[in-house]
């Protein structure tokens, strides 16, 4: 069981996703995660319709980030996002994979905004092969408002790539809003899930044109919505890394570190009946 004098007694290690705090500067996010008592943190250095952040190749930023991670005894779960868009280049993905290796991340996320599947698969294979050489993989995040709208589309990319280091992200909001049902998690294909991002949400989905707003700005803390999170947690493998991605309007006026702390408090209370199943090993950056 996990025991830390600052973080308390809790067997499930939890990461803080950048979107939970509405994407603050990365070094600030590390500080907030550490002060709030998280075990891990994510770095978001790539977004749709934007160039990869120059921080991904900045040696001074890497040095400062590593120092903060060590100070707060934090691991890095994910680096995001490799963005599959028609005009993207291999090097834009490579620099994120390189950063992930240097910072000690276990996951490199990818999103798909290109409806030419053959082109996506070709680029995915090239980046997966490069990542494998660094002992990393690529995890595809499906979103109902992207060109990879649900698990079936993401799994098609996994299968087409024929690469063992290509996986799928289970985001509980996107799982629900894309039409996912619990029985889907019993399919053998569900073994391709390698990472879970938790949030809650209202029972009624917004209109299709509002799905992105809900995803980026209006999720709910665990237990405050209608998603069957408990049933999901009972079905998923216990070796999946777990991160909180919960941008929430109710908490947005609190100082960012207090938002982080409150999300963690609520999450631990909600997850307590399931947390004993997790024995996740995520080593801090040295």
Regions flagged by a language model, labelled:
Residues 17-21, 44-48, 81-84, 111-115, ...:
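Active-site beta-loop-alpha junctions enriched in small/polar residues
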